[in-house]
Each structure stands twice: as C-alpha cells, then as structure tokens.
Amino acid sequence: MVSRLAKTTPERIVFSNKLLQFINFKQAMRSRKLSVDNRRGQLRREEIVAVIRPFSALRPPGDRAGEVASVPYDVINTEEARALAANNPLSFLHVSRPEIDLPDATDLHSDPVYRKAFENFEKLIKDCPLLTEEAPSIYLYRLIMGDHEQIGVVACCSIDEYDQDLIRKHERTRRDKEDDRTRHMLVLRAQTGPVFLTYRSSREIDTMMMETTMANAIFDFTAADSIEHTIWRVPDPVRFVHAFREIPFLYIADGHHRAASAARARAELKEQSFGHTGDEEYNFFLAVIFPDDQVQILAYNRALRDLNGLSTGEFFEGLKKSFDVKEDGVDTPKRRGQFGMYLEGRWHTLSLRADAAPPQGTVTSLDVSILQDRVLAPILGINDVRTDKRIDFVGGMRGSKELKRLVDEGKAAVAFSLYPTMMQDLLSVSDAGEIMPPKSTWFEPKLRDGLLIHRI
C-alpha cells in the first residue's frame, strides 16, 4: 500500500476546547422521551432521532495507517489472513485473526486464540505505536474503488437505540459468531472494526462532508487491492451531532454480528460495573454511516454442489414450472426477476414468469427469496442455506467468472448469478421489521479494521 502523507502525526494530539461542549451529550440523551409499543414493536415519542457521539479514537500515525489497516475479519479465512499478514508485523489481522500466529490445528474459539489477540493488540499499541486522541471527535471516511466513491461519518452509536430499533436491522445473527466477537471485544476492551450503517441521505450532511474534505486528511493511502482510503478529523463534531438529530433512523447495512456482539459485551460490562450511568463507552458501538445514495450493493451469488439426485432433464422440468429458460443466456442478469444459471459448460437465462411472481413489496419478492422459494428448496432440497453444506456463496467482486470456474472444475454442479438487491429494498424490509434471507447483500468496497478503534 502507498501512503500519501508526508508527515507523521504527533503522539499527543490536541484539539479545540470547543469539543468540551460535548460533555452535554449525556444530558441530551437523558432528556429524550421514549416509549415502546410492545404490541406492534414500534417506537413512539415526541422526537424520533438516532444520535451519534464523538469518541477518542485509538489509531495509528498517518504514515503507518496503510500497514495497519486490514480487511474485515469475516471476509477471509485463516489461510488468506495468514498470507495477507505475512511479513507485516503491523497488520491488524494479527489482532482480528490471531490464530494466524498459532499452530494450524488450533481451535479458532479456544482460550489461546483470545490470549494471542490480547498479546498482539498490546504489542501493536507499543510497536506501531497506536495513538489515543486526547479529545472526542468525529471523522469522515472516504473509499474510492474505480469510478465508485462513497464517504461516511465515523462516530459511535447508542446500543440503547440499537435495542429500541432506532438503528434498524434486516438480518438474523448466529449465536456462535456473536460468541466469538463478544469475547474478542471483552478481551481487548475495544471495538476494532466498525459497523456499516446507512441513512436516507441529507443535503445538509452532504454539504458538511464536502466542506470537511477540503482540509488535510489524517490518513490517505491506497491498499494493495487498489482501493483508496482517506480519513479526515471533523473540526466541529457538534455540527454533525445536531445534523443527525434530523435523521429519523439509521440502518445496519453490514455488520449485524458486530452490533449484536457490542450489545452483548455491554450487558456483561454493565453487570460488572459499579455505579453504571449509561454514559460509559461500552454503551456505544463504533460505526461508519454512509448516505444511502452512495452505497454500492453487489450480487451475492450461489453455487450448488449437486442436483439433489435429479437428472439434467428432471432439473429443467422443475425450473420450467416457474421460469422461462433460455439457452445460451447471459452470465449476469440485467433486471430483477432474471437469473443467470451455469450448468454443464453453458450459461442459461431464467426469467420468472408473471404467473409465478410473488406479491411486490414483500421479502418474498426479493430475487434471493425467489431463487430460494422456487429453486433451491423445492427442486434442490436446500431448505436452510445457513447450515446446508451443499451450497456455497460467491460474493460481489468474484463475479460470474468464479461461478464458471467452480462448475468447470467440478467443485459445483450448477451456479446461479443474481441481480443485486436494491438499497430501497433493504430500507423497506428494515422499516417493516422483516428479515432478509441470509447472504442477500454484498457491499463493496469494504471498510478496513484497525484505523479507528473504540476503547470500551
């Protein structure tokens, strides 16, 4: 990775005394009146808003940011993490995937793994060194991938508001994944990777972000995958806090397990705390919040290892009950309700027939649901994609070429490419309190871990 910062940030970073005004934050939090309608699961109060909070980040100096930053822990396996961190002792993967520094046979959820995470974290703090911002702040984080650019606000969000559904969800979580990240947070007493949130865009916030990016950045580097990462410290965070009070709801785009783990860690730390006030750092979780019109969702494709005992002819007969099937089709769908299917060396196009289409505006109308309800479950016998070992998921950037490779090499019998889920679908499903099928969305570019750490 290439750094474009000429100077190292001083170890002690001093901010304007204006930030001390934010001591009043907890008073604002306490003054808001909130009641929950348990029958409908909806919030009722005089003013519905989601509040953001500045925090004193633990972070690398500017000229080390590119070395420290790592991809999210959950998008790579141990072997990939070990390869990425090779010959780079500052890579945050030594903290987020500490098993890479232990023998191959190590149980990923055993005590030695979490001990190694703590040891590596303390070593990184000393060797990098990581610096603690003296005063709470808010940051802007810009990612550029090719022609795509998005910029979001880095701040902490309230776990109370997560619990109360002011921060809305669209995905179920798995207990085993929660267990892992909860323990990781408690051992480190830190949240090291942000939750990816979104909101319905605001012209006021867009203008404020544009003004902030005119100043010098604290981080500016290009990662090995050619994605540019730039972070600015906001000089007047109170303006952003006030602006977000006009935003009714925040939505989890990616990071449901991180958010759920932060809530569980808070419950445990609250239990251990004497004189809990609700203003402790463990009551908030680290997030990057992007406007919905900048977020890029890519397809999350599927590959199946067999045809569930069916012959090719029987399989096609099953498909024709719901789809028009075209041979020599496209590898990438052009619209909703259309699917690419690679089977026996050829691409086919599946187009959902009108008489088989579910009602619009529901979870069942999503393409991931249509594929599940019309093909995977009734024809191929995949009833639970969360646990069935016969299905693999191919996200985002790997595209149709990866699907073709899996089938051509005999690692899959058939593969399906999907049209990407739309952001409006995600917001609508979240607003309705519904749950999307697993692996419905793949977001690119990916945020990096280790750049701005929230200590709890």
Q: What feature does the model see in each segment?
A:
Residues 30, 41-456:
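Surface-exposed, charge/polar-rich loops and edge strands
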Residues 3, 22, 39-41:
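Structured catalytic/translocation cores of nucleotide/phosphate-coupled proteins
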